[in-house]
Amino acid sequence: MAKNNAAVVEIAQTASRFSSSIVLQAENKYIDVKSILGLFTTLVSNQQYELHVIGPDAEEAKAGMIEVFEKHGLNVVIAPE
C-alpha cells in the first residue's frame, strides 16, 4: 500500500503544477487528478485509466502525467479530444 500512497501523492503533485483540468476516468468514475482523496479511493495498479486534459498547458500536462503514471506502473492513455 505504501507504494500506492507514493503514486497517489506524486500524481496529485504533478497535476497541480498545471493549470489545465486533468480528469481521470476509471470505468464509469471521473476523478479530478489534483484530488488526493479521489485518487486514494480509485487508484489500483491492475486497471486501465484514461486521462482527459483540457486547458492552456494541456500538451505539457499530458506529457507530465503519462511520465508519472508510467513511473508507478499504472496503465494510462490520453483520451481523444
Predicted feature locations:
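Conserved NTP-handling cores and scaffolds of large molecular machines
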Residues: 18-19, 73
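Short, glycine-/small-residue-enriched flexible loop/hinge segments at domain edges that mediate gating
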Residues: 25-28
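Conserved beta-strand core positions
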Residues: 20-22, 47-51
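C-terminal structural segments of small proteins and small subunits
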Residues: 50-81
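Short, charge-rich amphipathic segments
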Residues: 1-6, 75, 79
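Amphipathic alpha-helical interaction surfaces in cytosolic regulatory modules
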Residues: 3-17, 32-45, 59, 63-66
